[in-house]
Amino acid sequence: MNAMLETPELPAVFDGVKLAAVAAVLYVIVRCLNLKSPTAPPDLYFQDSGLSRFLLKSCPLLTKEYIPPLIWGKSGHIQTALYGKMGRVRSPHPYGHRKFITMSDGATSTFDLFEPLAEHCVGDDITMVICPGIANHSEKQYIRTFVDYAQKNGYRCAVLNHLGALPNIELTSPRMFTYGCTWEFGAMVNYIKKTYPLTQLVVVGFSLGGNIVCKYLGETQANQEKVLCCVSVCQGYSALRAQETFMQWDQCRRFYNFLMADNMKKIILSHRQALFGDHVKKPQSLEDTDLSRLYTATSLMQIDDNVMRKFHGYNSLKEYYEEESCMRYLHRIYVPLMLVNAADDPLVHESLLTIPKSLSEKRENVMFVLPLHGGHLGFFEGSVLFPEPLTWMDKLVVEYANAICQWERNKLQCSDTEQVEADLE
C-alpha cells in the first residue's frame, strides 16, 4: 500500500534530475563560451599627446565596442581554434609575384609582392611590409584576407615567407626561420626601398612576426628610415618569460604548446636532408643526436633548445631567448608603434602584457590596444553564429595606418605653410 502511494512521486524525482543535468550543461556552456562577458571598447594605454589625440579622433575602432559573434565569439579558445583551423571565412586570393633573394650564407629567402588596387587616401606611395606568424607565409588565409583589404585601401604589400615554411620551396642552406632572426625580413625591406625609392613603409607583424619586426626596427636607427609606423598583433614580447607559462596547463597552454611543437617538427623533418644530411655543413653545435631528440620533443622549448638555437650558435636556451626577443629593443623604436593583444588570448599569459603596458606609459609614440576578446589572431566579427570574412584586426591595422599617413601629411603641410610664411617675411 505504501509502495503504491510513493510511485506517483518517482517521475517528479526524475524530472528534478533531468532539470539539474540540463542546468549543469547550460552552466558549463555559459562558462566555456564566456557568454556572460560584456562587449566593450578595447582598453587603451597611451600618453596624452597630439598624436594620441589625433589617433583617437581618426580611428573609430579604438573607441567603439568590438562585438564578436554572439554564440562563440567571447571564447578565446574558439576564436584561436577557428583561426588555426579555418584561418578566415571566404578568404580572397590576391594576385602577386614571388621574389627570391639569395642570402650571404646561401639561404634562399622568398617574399610575395602585391600591388595596390586603388589610390591611397593621401595619394602617396605606401608599402606594407608584413611578417606572418610562426611557420606562416603569404598563402595562409588570414594573410590573404589582410593583404586583399590593404590592397583595396591603396597599399602595396610585401609578405615575407618564413624560411622553410613554404612546402614547395626547398632550403638551400642548413638554416630555417627562428624566433627572432631578422635577416630575411631585412632583405625584403631593403629590396622594397631599392626598387621603390619614393615609397614609405608601414611595418606589420603578426604573432612571432610581431617580435621579428619590432626587433628589426630596434636593432639600428637606420632600419627606421622611411618607416611611417609599426603594428604588432598578438606577440608575447619575451620568450624567456613566456617559456614557463607555456608549460602550464592553465588556459590549455601546454596543449597549444604541444600542437605547435608537432607542427614545427613536421616542417623541420620535411627539410631533413637540407638540415641534417651527411653532405651538409652543419653548425658545429648541431649533432646527429639532436635529430633523435627532435622526434621525441613535445614542446617548442625542447625544439628550440635542441635545434633552433644552434642555427645561430647560441650556447643556451636562455641566451637564445634573451637575444632573440624584441623586449630589449622596444625602447629604441621611435616611429609610431601600435601593440595589439587580446585579453583572452590563451597563448599569451596576462603577465606578459605588463611589457607593452609599461612601454606605453613611458613612450609617447606607443599605444597599447587590449580588447577583451579576440583570442590569438582571431578577432572575428559577426552577429550570432557565422563570422564575417573581414576581421576587427584587419580593419584596425589599416585604419591605424591610414591615420598615421594622414598625420604625416598634415605635419608636412604645416611645415610647408610655415616655410612659405617665413619666406614672405
Curated annotation (Swiss-Prot):
Task: Write down what this protein is called.
Answer: Monoacylglycerol lipase ABHD2
What phylogenetic lineage does the species belong to?
Answer: Eukaryota, Metazoa, Chordata, Craniata, Vertebrata
What are the GO MF terms of this UniProt record? acetylesterase activity; diacylglycerol lipase activity; hormone binding; monoacylglycerol lipase activity; nuclear steroid receptor activity; triacylglycerol lipase activity
What keywords appear on the UniProt entry?
Cell membrane, Cell projection, Cilium, Flagellum, Glycoprotein, Hydrolase, Lipid degradation, Lipid metabolism, Membrane, Serine esterase, Signal-anchor, Transmembrane, Transmembrane helix
- Gene3D superfamilies per the UniProt record, alphabetical: alpha/beta hydrolase
* Activity regulation, per record: Acylglycerol lipase activity is activated upon binding to progesterone.
Record function comment: Progesterone-dependent acylglycerol lipase that catalyzes hydrolysis of endocannabinoid arachidonoylglycerol (AG) from cell membrane. Acts as a progesterone receptor: progesterone-binding activates the acylglycerol lipase activity, mediating degradation of 1-arachidonoylglycerol (1AG) and 2-arachidonoylglycerol (2AG) to glycerol and arachidonic acid (AA). Also displays an ester hydrolase activity against acetyl ester, butanoate ester and hexadecanoate ester.
- Indicate where this protein resides in the cell: Cell projection, Cilium, Flagellum membrane; Cell membrane
- Activity dependence on pH, as recorded: Optimum pH is 8.5 for p-nitrophenyl palmitate and 7.5 for p-nitrophenyl acetate and p-nitrophenyl butyrate.
